Every structure is written in structure tokens, then in C-alpha cells.
UniProtKB/Swiss-Prot annotation:
This is Uncharacterized protein C652.01. The lineage of its organism: Eukaryota, Fungi, Dikarya, Ascomycota, Taphrinomycotina. InterPro entries: BCALP (IPR009598). It comes from Schizosaccharomyces pombe (strain 972 / ATCC 24843). The chain crosses the membrane at residues 7-27. To N.crassa NCU05373.1.
Length: 108
């Protein structure tokens, strides 16, 4: 499953990207780093279930494919918590994380 690591940005792209972005991104990444058939099935399933995460469909014939999707209001109200790294601060409950073997402190 190491070949899927190149496709992680696909899951991090905001839902407001135009419709034509997803197939172009997939084709360019497949041309660059060809995943194994098993990982291609997993990647296809992840992209198809992407519609479950957003309030709009993946593709619709009711609008132009070059128009951007409406940004979900839940993210606007949450202060773009998914876009920034403040969710790590919320999850850890700390302002900084200390890594002793590196003698480094990461401030969130």
C-alpha cells in the first residue's frame, strides 16, 4: 500500500475544487506514479465515497463543470478547523508538544 501515499493529497483537497480537477489530478498522478491494481481499487472507492463527506454530489449535469462547488457552511462556521492545524491543538489539549529524543518542542 506504499503506492497510495502519492494520492493522499486527493483526500485533502477542499470540496470547492471544480469538477474537472479530480480526473485531471488522478490521471496526472497515475501517469507519474502508477499504483498497483489493489491500490487503484482502494483509490477509486475512496473517491467515490467522497460524496458521502460533502453535501453536494461528485458530478452534476445541472451546472457547468468549470464552476467551483459551494464551500460547505460547516467549515466556515468551524473557523476552517480542517484546513488549519488547530484541530491538533484541540485533539492534544496542549499548546506545544515536546519530542525528547530530538530535544525539540513543536508549538501549535
Amino acid at each position: 500500500m506504499l503506492c497510495l501515499r502519492y494520492f493522499i493529497p486527493m483526500l485533502l483537497v477542499a470540496n470547492a475544487a471544480p469538477y474537472f480537477f479530480y480526473p485531471i489530478f488522478m490521471l496526472s498522478m497515475i501517469a507519474r506514479k502508477y499504483p498497483c491494481p489493489y491500490c487503484m481499487i482502494i483509490l477509486g472507492l475512496l473517491i467515490n465515497t467522497r460524496t458521502l463527506w460533502s453535501d453536494s454530489t461528485f458530478f452534476s449535469f445541472n451546472r457547468n463543470i468549470f464552476d467551483t462547488k459551494a464551500f460547505p457552511t460547516e467549515l466556515k462556521e468551524a473557523g476552517y478547523r480542517l484546513v488549519r492545524l488547530s484541530w491538533i491543538r484541540w485533539l492534544a489539549g496542549k499548546e506545544s508538544i515536546h519530542i525528547p529524543w530530538l530535544d525539540a518542542t513543536i508549538k501549535l
